């Protein structure tokens, strides 16, 4: 711990100071310090306290005096000095100083032994330090809670912003709510609105008089003041009058909207002007014109839908016609092919029949020659034998008819064996020869 010499200018009250104490021993009262008192009194008092503590509590360490390391000057001069060369001296050696009175010198290098402290003592010290810091720093004090603001909406009037709510007297409140019950309204604002509409002619009269006379004369002002109440300047009255006169000049269709603005106290001047669009402003159309425009638009849409439907139907017809024509062409081609094949078959058959008729025995020569070998000798003898002219001729015709029937039967078998195709038949016929 650094051994420094401090000077202080604080004054201590005449009362005894009680320092924090623990449970083992009570605190000892200390004499108050004053610049006029001598240092000897302080040292005597401190030594007496330490001796008593050593006698009573030999197991505890000595508690150092709070003024053992401070040097007090009577002239209240601020001076701090430190001499490192005096660290090796004894405890009772004093440090010479030429700037102060020699009687105020006292030991500096007293060895200080740390005394163990208990938790209760540390808690008390912390609480005292917090109290001192809060008392010295006003910023550390808790800030006051802000007052509760009025969250009700306000309205702008000629005399400034006002609250929308109003406090009625007992008589006026009874009359107002009685009128509200008779009219069947659910809100008091509707009742007040009804009263304003009933009193509108009189209000307009007052407003016109205010607008014609920009500044009131003494007579006019005295006549109108009791009706409107006290206002500070004539400009407020002029503004109030202009609000009613402008509303009266407007159309009767918008009376409800303007009346609502008057009740709320919202003037036209307070509204923000919207920037004009670059495109030209279209004229307001009436209901009939808008209905006609809607009908024309519907007609145009119906025409477009019909055109689309017609186009689709035409496409379908064209596709169907193309498909029908294509099918007919395919059918005609098939028919022509069938006719050609049938014609060729008939033509070939005719040719074959003609050839067979002309060269019937030549076509089936081998077959006939083979069949002749199987004919009985009797029939052959009958054909060749001619004892009588009539009998052999008959037999010859019979044998010839039998041969013809056999040839025809075999020809039909040959025809069916070759198949139905005439080309194959002609090919086989050519190969035979």
From Swiss-Prot:
Residues 287-304 form the R domain. Expressed in unelongated axillary buds, and, to a lower extent, in axillary structures such as flowers and siliques. Pfam families: TCP. PROSITE patterns: R, TCP. Residues 130-163, 247-281 are annotated as: Disordered. Disruption phenotype: Increased shoot branching but reduced response to strigolactone (e.g. GR24). The triple mutant brc1 brc2 abcb19 is insensitive to GR24 treatment but is partially restored with regard to shoot branching. GO terms for cellular component: nucleus. Induction: Induced during environmentally induced bud dormancy (planting density). Repressed transiently after shoot apical meristem (SAM) decapitation (release from apical dominance). GO terms for biological process: regulation of DNA-templated transcription; regulation of secondary shoot formation; secondary shoot formation. Keywords: Developmental protein, DNA-binding, Nucleus, Transcription, Transcription regulation. Transmembrane segments: none annotated. Its main location: nucleus. It is found in: Nucleus. GO terms for molecular function: DNA-binding transcription factor activity; transcription cis-regulatory region binding. Residues 148-206 form the TCP domain. The keyword Chloroplast does not apply. Transcription factor that prevents axillary bud outgrowth and delays early axillary bud development. Indirectly required for the auxin-induced control of apical dominance. PANTHER family: TRANSCRIPTION FACTOR TCP18 (PTHR31072:SF226), TRANSCRIPTION FACTOR TCP4-RELATED (PTHR31072). This is Transcription factor TCP18.
